[in-house]
Structure formats: structure tokens, C-alpha cells
Amino acid sequence: MRIVFFGSPEFAVPALAAVAECHEIVAVVTQPDRPAGRGGKLQSPAVKEFAIARGLPVLQPAKVRDGTLAGELKALAPDLFVVVAYGRILPPDLLAVPKLGPWNVHASILPKFRGAAPIQWAVIRGEAITGVTIMRMEEGLDTGPAAALATAPILVDDTAGTLAKRLAPLGARLLLETLPRIADGTVALQEQDSAAATLAPPLAKVDGQLDFRQPACVVSAQARGVDPWPGATMLLEGEVAKVFLPTIVDGQGQPGEVLGLMSHGLAIACGTGVIAFSEIQLPGRKRMPAKALLAGHPIVPGTILGRLNPT
């Protein structure tokens, strides 16, 4: 089939690689290059880098709603669109272009976690199981009927990053299994139950601010769900520190009380339970083991950490 692939981050690369092996990619549509890092150097999306390495034609439109992209893609006479974490909502004129429709690989079991950050919110909300859904796209936000789904467990130490690395190839395999049924018209569609829908909006930096008044299990899920971005943050001796690799450990204390260095890292009491962070990163410093950091920045046990958002 003649396919236009929409995608941007690393998560979308396995799906593009799989489709390119079996079908003709007539265009790869991805986000524009954007400044990144302290130097503000332009960085290309992972999908663009992969596509160029494979000799695939790349489009990076600044706008998708002015009709220009729809006209360009219509001229390519695509059979269908495959959309994987593109990062923009496609307007009706684009959705109407492919003969066999636009299809999305969404990283949740729809209708749960509709939106831009389904992997992150599944971890933050403490879900035990998630998955990927192949969905026929329509104008609503991830509201289209499902063609296929596959499930995966969320492991106790999963971060959003590690979970994404497992879901990406799972989605690619499910897509390859589903495309033949789309092509021959035998695909069976299941309408979503909108009453059961939950949302997964884009994350903001505030979503990483930890509140140790919450139970340790809630703090742990939040810290893992915002890893790698925006990162879990706490106020440590007046500085905003990022913390990583949480483990729930035995102990007790006041919420926000530093209990000292344990085998799993810096231990901090929560509303109920205790959490230990194995690695810490101070502003302008590299991420390092808690033991190494505390050797140069000792914290007296019994210290009560301040809150980034005191409300």
C-alpha cells in the first residue's frame, strides 16, 4: 500500500521501520526541527533522522490547517495514513485524504488515557496494565473506533521512558498485523465507550513537583511517570533537585522528613510510608547516586523538606 506516515519522537520509529519494510512510504510527515539544550541548537525529530537515513521523503510543515499539506498529500494518492505520536491534531481536510482512512497507533487501552501523554499518565495514576490501540481516526481527540489492541503490564519500577520502549515495538507489531485487514476490508471496528473515557493531557513542569504529604505509593508513581520529562522535583536545602529511581522502603516520620541514607538511596517520609531515591541531580550538576551527592552535601536526618508548591 501507499502510506503517508505521521510521527515525531523515538516512540514512532519502530512503527515507521516496520511499515517501511512491507509497504511504500510516499511521505513521512514530522514536526519541524526545534532548538534544544542549553545552546539552543536545532534538533531534528527522531522520525526525521530515521527517514533520511532510509532515503524516505520527509515533510516538516509548520502548519497543518491551512490546506497546503492536504493538497500536497492528496497529490501523492495515498491509500492510508499511519499516525504515531505526531504531536498535532489533524484537521478534517487531512483526515479525508487517504482512500482507506487515517489510522493511529495510540499508547493506551482506549478509551482510557485519550490525549498526548497516555504512557506518562498511566504510570502516574498507578495503573497495573496498559497497552496500545489501533484506531481509525476521526475529528475528536482519540475518539475513533478501535481496530485492534494489545496489552502490557506496567512493572513496579517502570518509568514513562522504560514503558515507552516496550510499548513502541508492541505497537509496531500490532500495526503490521492490522494493516492487511484494513487493506482487504475485513477489519472489525469496535466503537469506544465514551462514558469510560479518561484524559491524558500534555505534561507541564508543575506535574513533576512532588508532595510528600501524599502516600509513598502515589509519590513513587508520580516520580516514575514524569521520568524522563519533566522530571520529579523537590526542594532540597533551598535548591530545586531532580530525583530518580524511587523505591518504597520501611520506616516512618513526618511528611517531608529526611530519614537519612538507606541502601536504596535518600529516604524521605511521606503521608504514609517512606520513599527512597537512588539518584539525585542538583541544578547545573550531573545526575549522580544519592550516596555520592550526600557525601559532598550532607543533609541532617530529621530535616523537613520545604514544598515547591506550598498550597
Predicted features along the sequence, with ranges:
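Conserved nucleotide-sugar phosphate-binding/catalytic loop shared by glycosyltransferases and other
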Residues: T30-A36, Q43-A62
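Internal alpha/beta domain cores that form substrate/cofactor-binding pockets in large enzymes
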Residues: R2-V4, V26-V29, P57-L76, F81, ...
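A residue-level signal for conserved active-site and pocket-lining positions in enzyme catalytic cores
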Residues: G7, V28, A51, F81, ...
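Structural motif corresponding to alpha-helix initiation and N-cap regions
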Residues: V13, K41-S44, D66-A70, R88, ...
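Amphipathic, non-transmembrane alpha-helical secondary structure
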Residues: V13, A17, A70-K74, L176
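An anion-binding loop in the catalytic cleft
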Residues: D207, F212-T311
